[in-house]
Amino acid sequence: NTPSTVRPNWTDPEVIVVRYGTRQTTKSECYYNFRAYREPDAEMTMDYFFWIFRSAEQTIVIDTGFSPEAAIARKRQPVVAPADALARLGIDPKDVKLLVLTHAHYDHAGNLGLYPNANIVMSRKEFEFWGTDMGKRPQYGHHIDPLDIERIQALHREGRITLLDAPQNTLIPGIELYELGGHTPGQMAVVVEMPEGPVILASDAIHYYDELEQDRPFAVLDSLADMYRGYERIREWLQRPGAVVIPGHDPDVMNRFAPVDASDPSFAVRIDAHGAGV
C-alpha cells in the first residue's frame, strides 16, 4: 500500500524533530555484521529524537524519549529533557490528547507519565511481544526499560492504549501509521501528508540515512528480512513528489531541515508549508 495523496486542509501544519540526547559510537556497533563490508571502523554520532505534529487544530506527539533514569543508567548524554523541550515549544503535555508509540524501546517509550490525558496508539504485535518470555531474553530485553513496559501495560488496563492490528492504519485523516517490523516486531513508521509532500517519520525502521542509501541494516533487529522490506517500502514512498524521510537517530537530520530556533540550531528542526528543509 502507498500513503494516501489526499492532503487535509490543516491550518499552519508543521512537523517538529526534537533532538533530546546524543552519544558517540562506532560503525561496528551500529551496523549489523559490519565486518562483512570489509571497511575500516570509524566513530559515529548517534542522536536521539522524538517528533511532534502540530497544526492550529491539533498537537500529536510521536514517541516520548528516554527517561532521566535511563540516561544515567545507560550513560547517554541528555541534550534537553523532553518536558523542557515541550515547554520551549509552547506545548503543555497535559493538553496532548493523542500520542503514538512507534515501538517500545527505552529511548522511545520513557516519560509516558508526562501525558496524563493522552490516548496512546501502538501496534498490538509490539505491545504483546514485550509481555512474552521471548521479550525478556537478554538480546531483546537489553533494549527496553522494564518500568516502561510496566507503565504501558498499566495504561492498557486503564483503557488508554489503542492497539492496532492492521499493517496500515489512519491515525487522523492525513497521517498514516505503517507497521514495518524489522527493528522490533511491531515497529511503525508515520507518514504525514504535508502541503509540500509526505514527511516520512521512519523512527527506527531506519536509524541512519546510510541504511537506506547503502542497504546497510542496523545492528539491533528482530527480523533482518523485514528490515530490508521496510527499506523497500520507504524507498517507494520517497518516489512521491516532495517526499522527505526522517531517520530515527541520524545527526544529519539537524543539517537537512530548518531550525525551530535559529539561536539554538541543535535543539529542534521543523518541516512546514514554507519548505521541506534548507
Language-model-detected regions and their locations in the chain:
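Core dinuclear metal-dependent hydrolase active-site scaffold
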Residues: N9, V17-Y20, W51-R54, I60, ...
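Active-site metal-binding loops of divalent metal-dependent hydrolases
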Residues: Y20-G21, T64-S67, A104, K125-E126, ...
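Active-site metal-binding motif and surrounding structural segment of the metallo-beta-lactamase
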Residues: R76-M122
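Histidine-centered catalytic micro-motifs
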Residues: L99-A109, E179-Q187, I246-D252
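Hydrophobic/aromatic beta-strand patches that form the interior of the parallel beta-sheet core
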Residues: I16, V100, V121, T162-L164, ...
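Metallo-beta-lactamase
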Residues: N1-I91, D95-L98, K125-E179, E196-S203, Q239-V244, ...
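Cap/insert and terminal regions of metallo-dependent hydrolase folds
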Residues: A73-R76, D84, A189-V278
